[in-house]
């Protein structure tokens, strides 16, 4: 198994993220998919697989995930033409719910602060 340096691994992940961010809106033209934003790319040390974490605005995450999974092979072939490397990682899409969790936590904190302020004013 061939391993790459962490620096090269990160540069490649960044390049894949930039390329996919350009390709996805162009190749998956569907208003029902909403706005897909790529959060991060995690590559395996041997560069065989890439976990692509995304969020979506204005559509159901499950619908966007299904569409991305269906087009993963096509996006892979487009990346292969762009990257000019021997092995392009297989793409595995994952919905990143951390943004939603962050918003929920922020709302809970706001509610707790508001409740404390009401208690102090009594």
UniProtKB/Swiss-Prot annotation:
This is Ribosome-binding factor A. One of its GO terms (biological process) is maturation of SSU-rRNA. It comes from the Bacteria. InterPro entries: KH_dom-like_a/b (IPR015946), RbfA (IPR000238), RbfA_dom_sf (IPR023799). One of several proteins that assist in the late maturation steps of the functional core of the 30S ribosomal subunit. Associates with free 30S ribosomal subunits (but not with 30S subunits that are part of 70S ribosomes or polysomes). Required for efficient processing of 16S rRNA. May interact with the 5'-terminal helix region of 16S rRNA. Pfam families: RBFA (PF02033). It comes from Polynucleobacter necessarius subsp. necessarius (strain STIR1). GO terms for cellular component: cytosol. Gene3D superfamilies: 3.30.300.20. GO terms for molecular function: ribosomal small subunit binding. It is found in: Cytoplasm. Keywords: Cytoplasm, Ribosome biogenesis. Belongs to the RbfA family. Monomer. Binds 30S ribosomal subunits, but not 50S ribosomal subunits or 70S ribosomes. The keyword Cytoplasm applies.
